[in-house]
Curated annotation (Swiss-Prot):
Gene3D superfamilies noted in UniProt: Cytochrome P450
EC number: 1.14.14.19, 1.14.14.32
InterPro entries per the UniProt record, alphabetical: Cyt_P450, Cyt_P450_CS, Cyt_P450_E_grp-I, Cyt_P450_sf
Reaction catalysed by this enzyme: a C21-steroid + reduced [NADPH--hemoprotein reductase] + O2 = a 17alpha-hydroxy-C21-steroid + oxidized [NADPH--hemoprotein reductase] + H2O + H(+); 17alpha-hydroxyprogesterone + reduced [NADPH--hemoprotein reductase] + O2 = androst-4-ene-3,17-dione + acetate + oxidized [NADPH--hemoprotein reductase] + H2O + 2 H(+); 17alpha-hydroxypregnenolone + reduced [NADPH--hemoprotein reductase] + O2 = 3beta-hydroxyandrost-5-en-17-one + acetate + oxidized [NADPH--hemoprotein reductase] + H2O + 2 H(+)
Pathway note: Lipid metabolism; steroid biosynthesis
Residues binding heme: 445
Membrane-spanning residues: none
Gene this protein is translated from: cyp17a1
Function noted in UniProt: Conversion of pregnenolone and progesterone to their 17-alpha-hydroxylated products and subsequently to dehydroepiandrosterone (DHEA) and androstenedione. Catalyzes both the 17-alpha-hydroxylation and the 17,20-lyase reaction.
Entry protein name: Steroid 17-alpha-hydroxylase/17,20 lyase
Chief location: membrane
């Protein structure tokens, strides 16, 4: 009988151990995605120690493990999705199931414990919050005269600066950042800044500090207990966030002090109006926990993400244009034929400038500003394709793999705007479903319409007047890029030459305005 008792005890231990492993997501299941080698505590960290940027490394692993596989970041199971079929299942068909967000130390600092849209977890509060933000953005969104006027003002200022800089090699990044920042600041709280403005310089400084620290992928987000020890990056992050929050609080208090339901100047006013309206209609914001913090973090989201991403796409666009002067000439020929020199490009011209639109789409494809989408979290047990996914599992869509899939894109490493045009070259088309530059579904980027509008107007204004070139005697800048918060191009300089005939055109415009 002794052996029977031992057998029963052993079997009981095995059953309990297997159960515990299952509920923590570590059970080896034939239906689970292939998993990278994993060790207790550290997970798969030793297996993902690579010199390649993560989006490239994950694409390389696709050859060994398939389109969908998993790895363990410490105790957290993470699934990597590398094709558009599974990506759209996660983002669209099962969007609400995978709408969660992971809590990390750095994002909690950035967002006051997830009180924003981008990193906030999926909940009744988040849905109500997103609804009022979406409504507010629609009032200033694509096609509205107010936002077009704001962008054109900054595009005009940018062109004036380029005119003064012509024939001189310059890094355009600071001026692009200022122009896009002014668009976002005007949209959010009716402020714009000139070069050297102290408040503007403070914004740039804290924004850069946030980007530099978040970009380091600190181990504290994998092992939160590490925050108990001195951490210089977290100290810098908290200081920069504190400076940001003081500025946002100042703007918010100013808006609350002179708020009027009859006047809507900007996004802050729109958010205040929506919040007040919901309270007056007995749609209690307390029921969903919506606070002033949520509105502040929303504006922080729009400012942080809106400036960094759009500026980066503009830098990539200019870089590819100087690499491909024939593309630049085709855009200019299109601008000359459809707009001429007697007026500036407008929103209504978008439909008449398919080659420019195709070029923007190709830039977003070949160098997606967020090659890895923000991680999603499964809110319940589910499936992705044939694989089982347990509740709490994190899912990352590798947008880089989608946009460089050789099964979907012919010569994906080749910059070719024509792939987004029909055979006649006069109309836009979608050559592949493997294209999601702004994400999709429940978590789609709220600023998509604004970003597209900025890209179109800034590039059309610049290329109507200027030809962008590499400084004489210098090699073409590299196209590799640096993976940080977004995929940034390396620093480079460019010469903006005023196009032939524009000197007289500008003089004529100045005399008419005078």
């Amino acid at each position: 009988m002794g052996w029977l008792i031992c057998f029963c005890v052993f079997a009981a231990i095995i059953i309990v151990a297997l159960y515990l492993r299952k509920i923590h997501g570590f059970l080896v299941d034939d239906r689970a995605p292939p998993n990278l080698p994993s060790l207790p505590i550290i997970g798969s960290l030793l297996s993902i120690n690579s010199n390649s940027p993560p989006h490239i490394f994950f694409q390389q692993l696709q050859k060994k493990y398939g389109d969908i596989y998993s790895l363990d970041m410490g105790s957290n199971r993470v699934i990597i999705v590398n094709n558009h079929h599974h990506a759209k299942e996660v983002l669209l068909r099962k969007g609400k199931i995978f709408a969660g967000r992971p809590r990390t130390v750095t994002t909690d600092i950035l967002t006051r414990d997830g009180k924003d849209i981008a990193f906030g977890d999926y909940s009744a509060t988040w849905k109500f919050h997103r609804k009022i933000v979406h409504g507010a953005l629609c009032m200033f969104g694509e096609g509205t005269a107010s936002i077009e006027k704001i962008i054109c003002r900054e595009a005009s200022s940018m062109c004036e600066i380029l005119t003064n800089l012509q024939s001189s090699a310059a890094d355009l990044a600071p001026e692009l950042t200022r122009a896009v920042t002014n668009v976002v600041c005007t949209l959010c709280f009716s402020s714009s800044y000139k070069r050297g403005d102290p408040e503007f310089e403070a914004m740039l400084k804290y924004s850069q500090g946030i980007v530099d620290t978040v970009a380091k992928d600190s181990l504290v987000d994998i092992f939160p207990w590490l925050q108990l020890f001195p951490n210089e990056d977290l100290r810098i992050l908290r200081r920069c966030v504190s400076i940001r929050d003081k500025l946002l609080q100042k703007k918010y208090e100013e808006h609350k002090a002179d708020f009027s339901d009859n006047i809507q100047r900007d996004l802050f006013d729109a958010l205040l109006r929506a919040k007040n309206s919901s309270e007056n209609n007995n749609t209690s914001t307390q029921d969903v926990g919506l606070t002033d913090d949520h509105l502040l973090m929303t504006v922080g989201d729009i400012f942080g993400a809106g400036v960094e991403t759009t500026t980066t796409v503009l830098k990539w666009s200019i870089l590819y244009l100087i690499h491909h002067p024939q593309v630049q000439r085709k855009i200019q020929e299109e601008l000359d034929a459809k707009i001429g020199r007697d007026r500036h490009p407008q929103v209504n011209d978008r439909g008449n400038l398919p080659y420019l639109e195709a070029t923007i789409r190709e830039v977003l494809r070949i160098r997606p500003v967020s090659p890895l989408l923000i991680p999603h979290v499964a809110l319940s047990d589910a499936n992705i394709g044939e694989y089982t996914v347990q509740k709490g599992t994190r899912v990352i869509v590798n947008l880089w793999s989608l946009h460089h899939d050789e099964k979907e894109w012919k010569n994906p490493e080749l910059f070719n705007p024509e792939r987004f045009l029909n055979e006649e070259g006069n109309s836009l088309c979608c050559p592949s479903l493997s294209y999601l530059p702004f994400g999709a579904g429940v978590r789609v980027c709220l600023g998509e319409a604004l970003a597209k509008l900025e890209l179109f107007l800034f590039l059309s204004w610049i290329l109507q007047r200027f030809t962008l070139e590499v400084p004489g005697g210098q090699p073409l800048p590299e196209l590799q890029g640096k993976f940080r918060v977004v995929l940034q191009p390396q620093k480079y300089k460019v010469i903006a030459r005023l196009r032939t005939g524009w000197e007289k055109s500008l003089q004529s415009q100045e005399s008419e305005s005078g």
